[in-house]
Amino acid sequence: ILPGILTFSKINKISIKIIVAINKLESANTFSNKFNQLKDLLGIDDLVKYEFIFCNGSSKNFISQYSKNNKLVAGIISIPDHLHFEWSKTLIEAKIPILVVKPLTLKLEESNELFNLSKDLSIPIFVEFHKRFDRQLKYAKDSFMKGLIGIPLYSFTEYTQRKEVPLENFRSWVEKSNIFSYLGVHYVDVIKYVTGSTPKRVSATGQKYFLSSKGINTFDSIQCNIIWETNNKTLFNQIIISNWVESNKSSAMSKQDFHLIGTSGRIDCEQKERGLRILTDTNYTEEINPDFTRIFSQKESFIFEGYGIDSIKNYLHNILNQDFQNLDCRACNIKEALSST
């Protein structure tokens, strides 16, 4: 998210001030070091500045401190999954447009409450489903809409991440979420985006073996089955298999693919092996995704590119222009996000 904000500022030559909600000094130091490193790499001088608000994890404290003498133009919520609802509700009640990293919330009733609140206050909520900006999936959407694969019959996806994600990266809150809400939900939205269909029925099965043996009470893997209804009232099946107990020696952080099969053809998107690998004497073979979020050299500085960056840039553009009636179809508003909750 920070690379996206800095890149947007650099490209558009717009001054931005970032207000960061912080719980502890250690987090502030980590942010400062990362910010200064990226600012120097991108060569943006003082276009972007920041300040901290120490709020002890309370969204109410954050708003009460900030609203004394400032005005927030846009909010981005990138925090543990189980906190999304509280912070989203507080910012919307303060009439601050927000972008929430997926999932919107962990419970449908929470998402419905946010939807109604957003509608009543006329304050937009977007969900950061960055895969909508992936050119593979944009091509899949166009192909589907042209009718190239006919009537959809079924879709399947396997999406996995390394063990280090639940064991190390998210250990402090991993038990309060699950692998499907954190990861698999991406491909629920992919079907919504590509086909425009509506979910009608859902069922899921999960297993707890490896992580429970490490004292972590959450699912290793969840297999989800969703029945979708198209705008033409035909039904098709989606299967999403997700886990976060992949070997740490995997050639990429994420293994992922997307397949959509119809009566006249099929669309196959290989989203891990994108044709770029690197092997050195010091590291195993790594599968590189050059399309997500990568930093590339320019003449005297660097720039971030990729669909992860485009998602943030698109949100900031929409907020600054306030043209919500003519949104890019890739922007996921809260109404569309309800399908993935």
State where each predicted segment sits:
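A short helix->loop->beta-strand "cap" motif at the edges of active sites that frequently abuts
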Residues: 14-16, 94-96, 121-123, 233-237
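Active-site loop of classical SDR/Rossmann-like NAD(P)-dependent oxidoreductases
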Residues: 26, 30, 301-313, 332-335, ...
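Predominantly a Rossmann-like dinucleotide-binding segment in NAD(P)-dependent oxidoreductases
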Residues: 131-217, 224
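N-terminal Rossmann-like dinucleotide-binding module
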Residues: 1-45
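C-terminal helix-rich "cap/oligomerization" subdomain common to oxidoreductases
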Residues: 21-22, 43, 314-341
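Contiguous beta-strand/loop segments that form the cofactor/metal-binding neighborhood of enzyme cores
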Residues: 182-277, 310-326
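A structured beta-alpha segment of the ubiquitous adenosine-cofactor-binding alpha/beta core
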Residues: 41-73, 77
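Beta-strand-loop-alpha-helix segment that lines the small-molecule cofactor/substrate pocket
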Residues: 74, 80-132
